[in-house]
Amino acid sequence: GYDQKGNLIRQLEKVTQKQVEFYMRDTPQYPHTSTIISELLKRAIKNEKDDIEKIIKLTNFVSEYVEDDYESNSISVFDVIETKKGDCTEHAQLFTVLARAAGFPTREVGGWAYDGKNRFIPHAWTEVAIKLDDDYYWVPADPTWDMIIPVVHIKSNAESILGKFSLILKEINFANGEKIQY
């Protein structure tokens, strides 16, 4: 039979222990131990116990909390929290901070996303380390578009073979006339 979970795991990148430690750090860019962050986290996930459901709730919360604003000039995640505005980078930053506060190693990634208008555009989203069976795997989450494991994204700036793929995208002739937008 078809093993959906096994098939999913084979497609995800395994997380190393070093990465778990690195992507749980509290830093000026990702100050996840702040009281303000803790309060926002409680609003986002409430009393949820299931890890996957927590990620779904966080993705949905950030998508609804942050209004799309491509002119946003947020300096920190606290600016994003205060203004409730931002582009994909602000969505990803707030999600990263909240997910780390919830105990999930999380990283921002960037690359290309299909926008449904026959083009790929520069985009930022996140990857969350989730335990599946006995190991941790990077699971993509896009809080801008409220998507878990988006199939329309091509990562280019994290530790992945797909990063090399973005370099040749401009050479591909898409069947429906899709374009790469820089």
Please tell me what each predicted stretch does.
Residues H91-Q181:
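Hydrophobic/aromatic-rich core segments of domains that either
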Residues D3, D26, D50-D51, D68-D69, ...:
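Acidic-enriched, low-complexity/disordered segments with a strong bias for Aspartate over Glutamate
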Residues G1-L12:
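Extended acidic/polar, glycine-enriched regions
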